[in-house]
């Protein structure tokens, strides 16, 4: 089993898909990475050689922030927005959508389950 950036890649998936299991690498970046290292996107993770794994690891570490470093950076950015008192920081603090989405309806993912209020009795 190949291990890159602290993540065990799934064995039976194509490299193009398996690389997206790493936080910070999506489909486009996975294709770019495979082109840079010369690894075939159709190759399965099981069939990788040690040299290919090493080259993938070297390019990832040299080029991008992924996994823990990226998560820490995102959290630091959110913390900074909260501390400086920006509107986005306020929305983060209140647990509401940050980028201008409607909240009268929807936004359930960010707000959590509905809190039902008892109706007026007759």
Curated annotation (Swiss-Prot):
Region: Disordered, residue numbers: 93-122
Organism domain of life: Bacteria
GO biological process, one term: translation
PROSITE patterns cross-referenced by the UniProt entry: RIBOSOMAL_S13_1 (PS00646), RIBOSOMAL_S13_2 (PS50159)
GO cellular component terms, semicolon-separated: cytosol; small ribosomal subunit
UniProt xrefs under SUPFAM superfamilies: S13-like H2TH domain (SSF46946)
GO molecular function, one term: rRNA binding
Keywords per UniProt: Ribonucleoprotein, Ribosomal protein, RNA-binding, rRNA-binding, tRNA-binding
PANTHER family hit by this protein: 30S RIBOSOMAL PROTEIN S13/40S RIBOSOMAL PROTEIN S18, SMALL RIBOSOMAL SUBUNIT PROTEIN US13M
Homology family: Belongs to the universal ribosomal protein uS13 family.
Reported function: Located at the top of the head of the 30S subunit, it contacts several helices of the 16S rRNA. In the 70S ribosome it contacts the 23S rRNA (bridge B1a) and protein L5 of the 50S subunit (bridge B1b), connecting the 2 subunits; these bridges are implicated in subunit movement. Contacts the tRNAs in the A and P-sites.
Subunit details: Part of the 30S ribosomal subunit. Forms a loose heterodimer with protein S19. Forms two bridges to the 50S subunit in the 70S ribosome.
Protein's name in the database: Small ribosomal subunit protein uS13
Organism field: Corynebacterium efficiens (strain DSM 44549 / YS-314 / AJ 12310 / JCM 11189 / NBRC 100395)
């Amino acid at each position: 089993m190949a291990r890159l950036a602290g993540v065990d890649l799934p064995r039976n998936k194509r490299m193009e898909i398996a690389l997206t299991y790493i936080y910070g690498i999506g489909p486009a970046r996975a294709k770019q990475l495979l082109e840079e290292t010369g690894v075939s996107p159709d190759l399965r993770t099981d069939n990788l050689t040690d040299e290919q794994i090493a080259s993938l690891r070297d390019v990832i570490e040299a080029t991008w922030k992924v996994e823990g470093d990226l998560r820490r950076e995102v959290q630091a950015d959110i913390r900074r927005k909260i501390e400086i008192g920006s509107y986005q920081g306020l929305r983060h603090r209140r647990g509401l959508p940050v980028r201008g989405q409607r909240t009268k309806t929807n936004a359930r993912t960010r707000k959590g389950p509905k809190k039902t209020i008892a109706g007026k009795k007759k």
